[in-house]
């Protein structure tokens, strides 16, 4: 069975694992999911990630971060979706919770946080936001 929105599936798995207080979560891997996990790690929302399993069907294992028993990710939500893509120019990139959160942007130079995209002067598709 094909999946219509693998990014939403990834975000839901991370959200559910946090609610269940799991140490890590596994999901099917892809280049875009690895890039999103890299941004989450750079911004301090997850401990790390690694690819495990066979070469034909790799699995992405994300190690979640907790601070004093509370999840590092309070909210994680899909912004642009397959039925309604959302693109923003460099001057229109969203600020999540007045700069306390992070938007993850897919640009022509790769996947990056909203702060990096603003600093480099890039716009792109707003994939999701994290707080």
Swiss-Prot record:
Parts of the chain that traverse the membrane: none
Gene Ontology BP, a term: translation
Pfam family, one: Ribosomal_S8
Record InterPro entries: Ribosomal_uS8, Ribosomal_uS8_CS, Ribosomal_uS8_sf
PROSITE patterns: RIBOSOMAL_S8
Domain of life from the UniProt record: Bacteria
One Gene Ontology CC term in the entry: ribosome
Keyword terms: Ribonucleoprotein, Ribosomal protein, RNA-binding, rRNA-binding
Annotated GO MF terms: rRNA binding; structural constituent of ribosome
Subunit note: Part of the 30S ribosomal subunit. Contacts proteins S5 and S12.
Family according to the record: Belongs to the universal ribosomal protein uS8 family.
NCBIfam families: PRK00136.1
Protein function: One of the primary rRNA binding proteins, it binds directly to 16S rRNA central domain where it helps coordinate assembly of the platform of the 30S subunit.
Protein name per Swiss-Prot or TrEMBL: Small ribosomal subunit protein uS8
UniProt source species: Halorhodospira halophila (strain DSM 244 / SL1)
Lineage summary: Bacteria, Pseudomonadati, Pseudomonadota, Gammaproteobacteria, Chromatiales
């Amino acid at each position: 069975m094909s999946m219509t929105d693998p990014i939403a599936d990834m975000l839901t798995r991370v959200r559910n694992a946090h609610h269940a207080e799991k140490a890590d979560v596994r999901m099917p891997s892809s280049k875009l999911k690895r890039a999103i996990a890299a941004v989450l790690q750079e911004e301090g929302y997850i401990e790390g990630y690694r690819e495990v399993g066979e070469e034909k069907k790799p699995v992405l294992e994300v190690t979640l971060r907790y601070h004093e028993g509370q999840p590092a990710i309070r909210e994680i939500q899909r912004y642009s979706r397959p039925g309604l893509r959302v693109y923003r120019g460099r001057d229109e990139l969203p600020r999540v919770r007045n700069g306390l959160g992070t938007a993850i942007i897919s640009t022509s130079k790769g996947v990056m946080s909203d702060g990096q995209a603003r600093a480099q002067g890039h716009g792109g598709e707003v994939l999701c936001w994290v707080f």
